[in-house]
């Protein structure tokens, strides 16, 4: 029987208190909240012209719905 003076165990991969096991347990919840926050961002920035020109008009299904088909005589100055 050999005597060892210290505990021979290895620690798992971790960053602070966050381990790989806890990340995999929280992954579905984090994906749900991330997707919901992205949808909220899309809803609240839909009316901003800067976002329409740079982002929304480049999405294939959403782009044609944002084009302005108003005749020039009906537009304000």
From Swiss-Prot:
It is found in: Mitochondrion inner membrane. Its main location: mitochondrion. This is Cytochrome b-c1 complex subunit 10, mitochondrial. Residues 2-21 are mitochondrial matrix. The lineage of its organism: Eukaryota, Fungi, Dikarya, Ascomycota, Saccharomycotina. Keywords: Electron transport, Membrane, Mitochondrion, Mitochondrion inner membrane, Respiratory chain, Transmembrane, Transmembrane helix, Transport. It is a single-pass membrane protein. Component of the ubiquinol-cytochrome c oxidoreductase (cytochrome b-c1 complex, complex III, CIII), a multisubunit enzyme composed of 10 subunits. The complex is composed of 3 respiratory subunits cytochrome b (COB), cytochrome c1 (CYT1) and Rieske protein (RIP1), 2 core protein subunits COR1 and QCR2, and 5 low-molecular weight protein subunits QCR6, QCR7, QCR8, QCR9 and QCR10. Present with 5590 molecules/cell in log phase SD medium. Pfam families: QCR10. GO terms for cellular component: mitochondrial inner membrane; mitochondrion; respiratory chain complex III. InterPro entries: Cytochrome_b-c1_su10_fun. Residues 46-77 are mitochondrial intermembrane. The chain crosses the membrane at residues 22-45. Belongs to the UQCR11/QCR10 family. GO terms for biological process: aerobic respiration; cellular respiration; mitochondrial electron transport, ubiquinol to cytochrome c; proton transmembrane transport. It comes from the Eukaryota. Component of the ubiquinol-cytochrome c oxidoreductase, a multisubunit transmembrane complex that is part of the mitochondrial electron transport chain which drives oxidative phosphorylation.
């Amino acid at each position: 029987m050999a005597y060892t003076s210290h505990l021979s165990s290895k620690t798992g991969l971790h960053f602070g208190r966050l381990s790989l096991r806890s990340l995999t347990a929280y992954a579905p919840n984090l994906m749900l909240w991330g997707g919901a926050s992205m949808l909220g961002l899309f809803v609240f920035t839909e009316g901003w012209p800067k976002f329409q020109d740079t982002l929304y008009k480049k999405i294939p299904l959403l782009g044609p719905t944002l084009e302005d088909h108003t005749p020039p005589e009906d537009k304000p100055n």
